[in-house]
C-alpha cells in the first residue's frame, strides 16, 4: 500500500484501487466506492466446503481476509490449519487455485470473470458486506479528463450479483 502511494506521488501511477486503508496525506484524494462482497473460491475439482479440510488455504494477510476467514471457520465448524501465506497479487492466487494448489477468501469483483467462465467455483458467498475499496489519486490530477472519466466509470460500475441468489454454501 505504501508503495502504491509512493508511485502516485512520483507520477508513475495515476490511480490506485485499494482495500480500505487509512491515508493521511493532503495531496492524496480517497474516494470510497460501493460495498463489495467476499467469497470463498476453489478450483473446479472442489464442490463442497467439507472437501476444503485437506486443501491449503492461500491467504493474503489483510484485515478483511482475516475477518471473513474467521466467519467461515465458525460457520463450517472446523479450523483451516493448512495455510500458505501469499504476498503476491490476487492474479497469482487465482492461478494457484486454478491449478488445484489451494483455495482462498477473495473479493468477488476479483474472481467474477473466472466464476462466470467456470474456471473457479464459489464455495461460499458471505451474506453481508460493508466493505469498500478505495479509489486513490493525487488531488491535483482529479480534473484531468482521462482520470475523471475512469473515476466516474468505477463509481457507477455495478457488479453482477446474480450468483448471490444461489445457495450460500456448498
Where are these regions (language model features)?
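Short beta-strand-to-loop elements that line the ligand-binding cleft
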Residues: 79-89
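A ligand-binding cleft/hinge motif common to bilobed small-molecule-binding domains
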Residues: 20-26, 90-123, 129
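Short beta-strand->loop
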Residues: 29-39, 117-131, 141
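Secondary-structure junction motif
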Residues: 55-79, 160-167
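Hydrophobic residues within well-ordered alpha-helices
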Residues: 8-9, 52, 95-101, 137
Amino acid at each position: 500500500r505504501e508503495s502504491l502511494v509512493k508511485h502516485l506521488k512520483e507520477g508513475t501511477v495515476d490511480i490506485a484501487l485499494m482495500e480500505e486503508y487509512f491515508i493521511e496525506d493532503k495531496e492524496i484524494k480517497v474516494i470510497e466506492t460501493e460495498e463489495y462482497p467476499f467469497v470463498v473460491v476453489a478450483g473446479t475439482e472442489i464442490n463442497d466446503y467439507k472437501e476444503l479440510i485437506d486443501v491449503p488455504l492461500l491467504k493474503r494477510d489483510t484485515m478483511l481476509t482475516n475477518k471473513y476467514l474467521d466467519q467461515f471457520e465458525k460457520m463450517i465448524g472446523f479450523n483451516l490449519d493448512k495455510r500458505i501465506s501469499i504476498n503476491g497479487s490476487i492474479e497469482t492466487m487465482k492461478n494457484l487455485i486454478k491449478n488445484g494448489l489451494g483455495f482462498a477468501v477473495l473479493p468477488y469483483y476479483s474472481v467474477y470473470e473466472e466464476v462466470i467462465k467456470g474456471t473457479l467455483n464459489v464455495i461460499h458467498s458471505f451474506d453481508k458486506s460493508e466493505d469498500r475499496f478505495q479509489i486513490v489519486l493525487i488531488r491535483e490530477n482529479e480534473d484531468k479528463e482521462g482520470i475523471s472519466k475512469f473515476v466516474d466509470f468505477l463509481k457507477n460500475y455495478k457488479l453482477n450479483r446474480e450468483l448471490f441468489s444461489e445457495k450460500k454454501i456448498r
